[in-house]
A protein has these predicted regions:
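Alpha-helical cap/lid subdomain in secreted, periplasmic
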Residues: 103-219
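Conserved SGNH/GDSL esterase-like catalytic core that processes O-acyl groups on lipids
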Residues: 37, 47-133
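Generic structural motif recognizing short loop/turn segments at the entrances and edges of beta-strands
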Residues: 12, 34, 68-73, 78, ...
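N-terminal secretory targeting modules
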Residues: 2-66, 70
Length: 224
């Protein structure tokens, strides 16, 4: 299973959810066994610091029992919500990942093999904003159903509170967990990881100076 050694961390964070949220997650581990091709869909919370996909793929490759050949593609739009993304076009586009150019300027071509898993996040306030919450649930369900019909496991990435608005942690945790339970989808509790890290390791700054986006350490924590 992807990042087995990190599954223990997920379990501990889900236990923390009983402290920060009144909702218990129904799905606590991924259904996919060692997904080789992962699509990440989101916004600047994902693409800051050269992208969360880079530390994630390094973590996967550092876990020898997972083998080789993992690919992660990141599709982001700054400031976007789930409603901005045409997920169907992403998973059906045969040109995504179809080539690479190495350091010697050699073009390598690849066959499109599709995706095993798609990790999605909404805008930082959308799940808790009174004028966006319904759309969060609508598109969480729409995208999840589409992915499942195409044999791709959907995963929601719970985002974190703004540094100066810690009350967002509980609010976001509840809405993401409810959406996950409604759609039978795993939620990776990144927001809870931020909360726990700041309590346990206050000397590590997880935030960019704007108090919203991740620092390098925050991006690495999101990947883990």
């Amino acid at each position: 299973m992807i990042l087995m050694r990190i599954s223990i961390t997920l379990i501990l964070l889900f236990q923390l959810s009983t402290v920060f949220s009144s909702v218990t997650p129904a799905v606590k581990e991924p259904k996919s066994e060692n997904p080789k091709s992962i699509l990440m869909i989101g916004n600047s919370f994902m693409y800051y610091n050269n992208g969360v996909h880079n530390p994630l793929v390094r973590l996967i490759r550092a876990t020898e029992e997972l083998g080789k050949g993992h690919k992660i593609r990141l599709i982001t739009i700054n400031g976007s919500s789930l409603s901005w993304h045409d997920v169907n076009s992403y998973i059906k586009n045969p040109n995504i990942g179809s080539f690479s150019i190495n350091s010697k300027n050699v073009l390598n071509k690849y066959d499109f093999t599709g995706f095993d898993m798609a990790i999605m996040q909404d805008c930082s306030q959308c799940p808790i904003h009174p004028e966006r919450k319904d759309l969060f649930y609508e598109y969480a369900e729409k995208h999840s159903n589409l992915l499942k019909k195409n044999d791709i496991e959907p995963v929601f990435m719970m985002t974190w509170a703004y540094k100066d608005k810690p009350e967002m942690t509980k609010q976001l945790a509840e809405e993401y967990t409810l959406a996950g339970n409604k759609n039978n989808v795993l939620v990776t509790p990144v927001g809870l990881a931020y909360k726990n890290s700041m309590k346990t390791y206050p000397e590590i700054n997880l935030y960019h100076p704007d108090n919203r986006h991740p620092s390098n350490a925050g991006t690495y924590l999101s990947a883990a």
